[in-house]
């Protein structure tokens, strides 16, 4: 497998300063986990926060552990969701510095911005419901009349609070008059942040718990809860694959983003947008932020993006065998444990040349 941590040159990192400043907070995973977040001085000293976010940090110290958790989840979820793609989000580990794949207004940066925005609001909403934050609690009881056989109760995710605090944090750099970066890039990033939050809102669903004799479920207590991050990330992956390339154009009295190929219509609020086309990520090219796919695992029988033909860009692949140990022949013993044997199995793996 290609490593997920890479050395990058200072020149490449400098190009990020204004454009991807709004996702530098993903770098809080490096040292933010070791901070107690009980002193406002921490907000200024740690890498990853631009000035406007530092001010929000000082006013909302109790939220910062959730921000750190969201940064971890964004990195993990991004890499898991795109593990079958040539661009597999490995460069996000360089945060708070980034290579051009995340600093040039690309399709990939659109996905990461949207995912980070959704993840932060999701994390805060869940933290409210679990009692981790002193400034919020369960979500409000739904206004809609409950259906037959259930009643509103439990503790729903506080989506309203999560959206308010999350958007204030991730949008702050683009809304600041002092921030660097082009106006087109700021509009793009704000748009993609909003798309991420909309997918999060669309994931809100009714969840229920049964009550009754012997699990008869004669009565159900229900609440509104968010779906898990993998579901939200997969929705955003679909939008990533169908993202629209845009240009910054004068329309009427103001400039706005319009589709490059279909500039007769405005950008839809539901679609991810990008300004700069990406390379194919087949070969290593640090100047483009491409790590290449050499030594990446591929699937010989797949016809999707993880197939050896697509992943290896026609270069071919090498095969090797690997022995794995797994649990097998498991038996349940009364009461109350399961005993399993350990079995060895030989599997064939394929890596790109």
UniProtKB/Swiss-Prot annotation:
Reproduce the UniProt comment on modification after translation.
Glycosylation is required for protein secretion.
Q: Which InterPro entries match?
A: Wnt, Wnt_C, Wnt_CS
The UniProt subunit note reads as follows: Homodimer. Secreted homodimers form a complex with wnt5a homodimers; tyrosine sulfation of both wnt11 and wnt5a by tpst1 is required for this interaction. Interacts with the transmembrane receptor fzd7/fz7. Interacts with lrp6 and ryk. Interacts with tdgf1/frl1. Interacts weakly with frzb1 and strongly with frzb2/crescent. Interaction with frzb2/crescent antagonizes wnt11 function in the neuroectoderm, but enhances it in mesodermal tissue.
Cellular component GO terms, alphabetical: collagen-containing extracellular matrix; cytoplasm; extracellular region; extracellular space; plasma membrane; protein-containing complex
- Alphabetized Gene3D superfamilies for the sequence: 3.30.2460.20
> Which species is this record about?
Xenopus laevis
Name where it mostly resides: secreted
Its protein name is: Protein Wnt-11b
So which residues are the signal peptide here?
A: 1-22
